[in-house]
Amino acid sequence: MSAPIIAIDAMGGDFGPRNIVQASLACLTATPSLHLVLVGQASLIEELIARHGAVDRSRLRVVNANEAIAMDERPSQALRGKPDSSMRVALELVASGQAQACVSAGNTGALMALSRFVLKTLPGIDRPAMIAAIPTRSGHCQMLDLGANVDCSAEALYQFAVMGSVLAETLGVKKPRVALLNVGTEDIKGNQQVKLAAGLLQAAQGLNYIGYIEGDGLYRGEADVVVCDGFVGNVLLKSSEGLASMIAARIDTLFNRNLLSRAVGALALPLLKRLQTDLAPARHNGASLLGLQGIVVKSHGSASVSGFQSAIQRAIVESRENLPQRLKGRLELLLQNGQT
């Protein structure tokens, strides 16, 4: 595939374009084949670019957008009332073929609504789902939905499982193990929609469905793809990130109590740094909206520079793998087998 072109919503997120522009320039330096389009208030973006010195402008373009979507803005207002928002213009670049992917740290609800409107969903998919990598004991698993769909039918959960399995395959996992997140592993556990989804998955051909999984099983690495509704997934994701930050803070406090603990900490520092890097939320930042006729990656609104770089890197990988087309081909077969 030709060099990836990624459209960046430069005005999204809690910090506006400051971190986003810095992360974008760092990615350009790290990936010589990458091309970026920064979308937003052009004068402000150009000012931020100028502060960072020499930049290869042959691989960087700035597209002006006169409006920005607030983090607390209603999706309906973003959809109908702001046709020239940075988020919408970035998505339209993907729809028109001028970019292969869009990355935004903006309002999640607005991004979902605009993505569905501008890019449309793949055949057979009712609603896109948000998926991201969750660190586990043995590596990581792909988990969806992470907040795009608070209430989900059994059919939606089935579609999420199919999409998650296909994504895991594109990332090199052979016969990915697919599980439904539940309050227990027994057949009688779970709400009605989870039980109905389990029946659909058990009957599906071409899916390696292994049954229910509990939260602790997720972290033990017992599945490659874990499926749940967006309410449960978002709570689990935020709790995981908070737990990782708390553990890092407690370790730091423990090793700085006195001279002896600082000496022990100095000896353990290389291992602790490695653990901190492996579990850092910034490393795993970037959730994909699966099920669209285009690539969209959602970054945390509060992402650091390195965190937003991770989101851009995820978009690069999916662009190089031509993920929407790969999804489309596999979805046609799996959805037909599962719902005929």
From Swiss-Prot:
SUPFAM superfamilies: Isocitrate/Isopropylmalate dehydrogenase-like (SSF53659). It is found in: Cytoplasm. Keywords: Cytoplasm, Lipid biosynthesis, Lipid metabolism, Phospholipid biosynthesis, Phospholipid metabolism, Transferase. It holds the Pfam family FA_synthesis. Pathway: Lipid metabolism; phospholipid metabolism. InterPro entries: FA_synthesis, Phospholipid_synth_PlsX-like. GO terms for molecular function: phosphate:acyl-[acyl carrier protein] acyltransferase activity. Signal peptide: none annotated. One of its GO terms (biological process) is fatty acid biosynthetic process. Its EC number is 2.3.1.274. Homodimer. Probably interacts with PlsY. Catalyzes the reversible formation of acyl-phosphate (acyl-PO(4)) from acyl-[acyl-carrier-protein] (acyl-ACP). This enzyme utilizes acyl-ACP as fatty acyl donor, but not acyl-CoA. Belongs to the PlsX family. This is Phosphate acyltransferase.
